Each structure stands twice: as C-alpha cells, then as structure tokens.
Amino acid sequence: MRTSQYLFSTLKETPNDAQVISHQLMLRAGMIRPTAAGLYNWLPTGVKILKKVENIIREEMNKGGAIEILMPVVQPAELWQESSRWEQYGPELLRFADRGKRDFVLGPTHEEVITDLVRRELSSYKQLPLNLYQIQTKFRDEVRPRFGVMRSREFVMKDAYSFHTTPESLQQTYEVMYQVYHRIFTRLGLDFRTVQADTGSIGGSASHEFQVLASSGEDDIVFSTESDFAANIELAEAVAMGESKPATEAMVLIDTPNAKTIAELVAQFDLAIEKTVKTLIVKGANETAPLVALILRGDHELNEIKAQKHPLVAEPLAFADEDEIKAKIGVSVGYLGPVNLAIPAIVDRSVALMSDFVAGANIDGKHYLNINWQRDVVLPEVFDLRNVVVGDPSPDGRGILLIKRGIEVGHIFQLGQKYSAAMNATVQGEDGKPLVMTMGCYGIGVTRVVAAAIEQHHDERGIIWPTDEIAPFTVAIVPMNMFKSASVQAFAEQLYTDLMAQGVDVILDDRKERPGVMFADMELIGVPHMIVIGEKNLENGEVEYKNRRTGEKTMIAKDQLLAYLAQNVRA
C-alpha cells in the first residue's frame, strides 16, 4: 500500500472527549471516527487491525473444532419471549417494530437465535456434540457509552455456542474452548488472567472471564501471590482473618447527634474504623421478611452479587429507601445497628469475629460502644457479604490477595439447559425419547480486544502493537526526500516491490511530507518495523532499520536488507 493511495487520517492533537488512552490513540491514528454516541465508523487502518484480530480468532476456533456460521443482527421478539429474556433484559435491548407491526430486537447476543436454529436442524443425539460460532455485529443500548470502543453500543463479537447430550460432554468442550482462548490471547500478545466469574444475565452454572490487565479496566481482578487462584472481585471468597476475642468493656449508649455516617463517627470519637459496624437494609425475597439487614465492618464494601445469592435477599439486590426503613424499624439510616433490630439480619464473616465494636443503637442520634456478640445481641446467620481487599488470605490457603484492574475481553459459560429447556430444544436420545440439549457459550469482544491491546502497549509517540500479526502494516518504508533523489526513489520502489512479492504487509510513505511527519505517523499507528532510506546512507551502501517496540536503530547493508527482514519480520 502507498500512502498516496490510502486514507491516512492521523491527527496531531488529542480530541477533548477521549478519556482513556486507547480512545485517544484510535482517534489520532485514524482508526475510528464517531458517528453518534457509542457508534463508530472504522477507517481503513482500524479495519485492517480488526480483520487481523478476527483472523487469529478464526484460525484458533477452527483448530478447536468449532464451525463458522453467520446469524442475523435483527432477531424476532418471539424468540426472546420464549426464553423469558424479553422481560428480563431491560433497556439495553433495543426493541422496534417492522411495517407489519411485528416486534424485533437488535441482537446484543444470540443464544435465542442459535437455539432456535439448532432445534430445527438437529434431530438425533448422533449429531452431537456440535460447536458453532460467528463473528458478528452486536448492539447493546448502553445508558452511558464511554471509553471509545471499550464500551460502545455497537461492537463486533465472536460468539460460539456448543450443544451436547450430557454435562460431561459440555465439560470436555468447555475445557477445549478454555485452551483455545488461552492460545488466542497469547497469540495476540496480551498480558491476561483467567478468572472465575459470575454468569450474569447470560445465566448458567459456571463461567470464566479472560481479563487483560490495564489501569483503565472497569473490573477488579483478584489473584493470589503464591498460587494460580484468580477471580473477578464479584466472586472472590472473603476469608475472615483472626479469631474472636472476649469482651473487655461493658456496652455503653452514647449520644451521636451529628454522626450519621461511619466517617463522621470515626472523626468525632477518634475511633478505629475497623472497630465500627454498618447496617445496610435491602429488600427481602419473600413477604414474611420484606426487609433484611446486611451487617458489615465499617471499612468493608458490600458485594451485591454475593449478597443476592442469600435466600432471604431479593434478586436483583435493591436497597430499601429511607421511608421504608423509618416505617419498619422506626429509625433513620445513620443510626441502624444489630442490637434490638426488628428485622432479620445477616452478618458478614469478618463482623462475626469482632468484639467491643461500635454500631448504631436503632435510636436516632445514638450509638452503642463495646457491643459483643451473644452477650449483648445474638449472633445472626453468618454469610460472605463483602468484597475482598488487598492482603486478605487467598481462599485456596496459599498466599495473600492482590487486586488489579482488568478489561474483560472474553467470557465462557456453561449454560446447561437454561435456553434449551425454555425453548424445547431437543433431539432424540439413545433411548428414543426426547433429550433436552445441554449448552455452552463462548464470547470474545473483538473490537474491545483492539482497545485492550492499545491500553497495554503504547508510549508517548503512539501505539506499540504487541505482535506483528495485528499491526496495520508490518513494515513501513520511509524514503527521505524521495522526489528530490532518484537513487532514494529507485531503492524505495524496488524494496516495496520485493516485499510485496514476499507477501509482507508493507506501506510505502510516498507523500510529499517532511521526514519528521512521516516518522511520527508511522510510530503513531504502530508499524513495528521501519526502513528509513536516505541519500547519504545509500551512498555508503546502507539503510536504517528502526524497531518500534525497542526503539533500537540499526544500520544495515542495503544488499543484506531483505535477508535481515526475512529473519526479523513476520509476514
């Protein structure tokens, strides 16, 4: 490719509305342009990178035994009604009617469509297992699209769906896909972690996320210092440290009219926050207990995913408002506590070990000091309610926990029969009876992978692609003063022809621009190998090679250049 024949839309300045580095660099490198909130045009440089990522995914999926198909973006509403997700999904699901007033959705995912397809196409257990995938556009009507393509409304996703006769067969394919994903993200050159994860709106019995480590990530990833344990913070078990100590002081009621929060309480009475307890009131799961108290240490954060798994807590978790609390308990939010509490309570493991702690007295303007379980109040049911923190023991008993930010780029699920049972997707079993198929699903956010790679691999000059395989061009030829030097032009043209013949993805910068502009643009878009051709160097029989990743510059004999590139460049 020649720059004179290419849409080379680089920007010198960073757009003001781009918050994260990947969004900034994708705009500056001419990869994307916004067309509406969360919607982007992909320009030639971006499309080249996107297609290269897709090809790596496609190659590894095919090696793993998956078969590529293509399903429509527009999906009939009745399939979503059949699975019950029409009501469950919420406003992220874009719904519309055609001219015949038939309801449709723009697909955020394709479980319903694939289940419908397979139940129509398969009839016998002999046709299973089967693993089908597509690389297709998705649409989720995000309330706040942000961070460029990291959280956009329209995006490209690889989604695969496997069908089985037994859970054991699903487990086998799940393990194959687990390894396929490892190969994909390793080939992409990403620093990633595989973590246990919540199944969320997709549902199912087990799932793993593939998280690219980056400070701009939206997820907290927990992992051990001494083992392979890793989990999304939503699922990481919080192990209580230490042992319960005996009471040392009598419980005392104190006036605290201006201490409605833990922070105010700690500041006014010079307390250690670790000695305080907070009481959160949430909606209950049944009419006999419409409100439930969740009791945590003052410095700990409620884990809503864990809490809503308790049978007394409504799912999804919802906090009671102040009026409900006042009507049921007779006290303002800032003065809630476990002593004389009139509703069922669940205590976090860490709180269960506390002694001589401080909490609201369930009387406005008052707190109790030196509360102790069993002596002052019966210990309620104990449950893991909190997020882990750095330094907690690893749940597997090996090492302590660290927490880093991550970008979720892949997610695999064991769906079981969630969709197949709801949609009556059966085949004839070995015994001749209808058999409900067991399912798995496996997703990769292709557009998000591009952004995640940039978040991990960049410098002050631009993008540094982690592998030649996904760079927009592998080699850039930068001839200095090409139109003033016949020798420079001739060598550049011949090198371009030779590399093209070898199948190298090469770009020749034949613009009438200053060398500094050409260097800056090639570094900005992340071309990993740059050949700089100057008249004086040619007279000495040399050209300059520059490596984008290391910044190293090397003078190479011009008659050895092709051999050098063959050794160091992946076509």
From Swiss-Prot:
Keyword Cytoplasm: yes
Known EC number: 6.1.1.15
Domain notes: Consists of three domains: the N-terminal catalytic domain, the editing domain and the C-terminal anticodon-binding domain.
MF annotations from Gene Ontology: aminoacyl-tRNA deacylase activity; ATP binding; proline-tRNA ligase activity
Assembly and oligomerization: Homodimer.
PROSITE patterns reported for this sequence: AA_TRNA_LIGASE_II
Protein name: Proline--tRNA ligase
Alphabetically ordered keywords of this record: Aminoacyl-tRNA synthetase, ATP-binding, Cytoplasm, Ligase, Nucleotide-binding, Protein biosynthesis
Subcellular location: Cytoplasm
GO biological process: prolyl-tRNA aminoacylation
Similarity-based family: Belongs to the class-II aminoacyl-tRNA synthetase family. ProS type 1 subfamily.
Function summary: Catalyzes the attachment of proline to tRNA(Pro) in a two-step reaction: proline is first activated by ATP to form Pro-AMP and then transferred to the acceptor end of tRNA(Pro). As ProRS can inadvertently accommodate and process non-cognate amino acids such as alanine and cysteine, to avoid such errors it has two additional distinct editing activities against alanine. One activity is designated as 'pretransfer' editing and involves the tRNA(Pro)-independent hydrolysis of activated Ala-AMP.
Lineage of the organism: Bacteria, Pseudomonadati, Pseudomonadota, Gammaproteobacteria, Pasteurellales
Organism (species): Haemophilus ducreyi (strain 35000HP / ATCC 700724)
The reaction(s) this protein catalyses: tRNA(Pro) + L-proline + ATP = L-prolyl-tRNA(Pro) + AMP + diphosphate
GO cellular component, one term: cytosol
PANTHER family: MITOCHONDRIAL RIBOSOME PROTEIN L39/PROLYL-TRNA LIGASE FAMILY MEMBER, PROLINE--TRNA LIGASE
Gene3D superfamilies: Anticodon-binding domain, Bira Bifunctional Protein, Domain 2, YbaK/aminoacyl-tRNA synthetase-associated domain
Gene behind the chain: proS
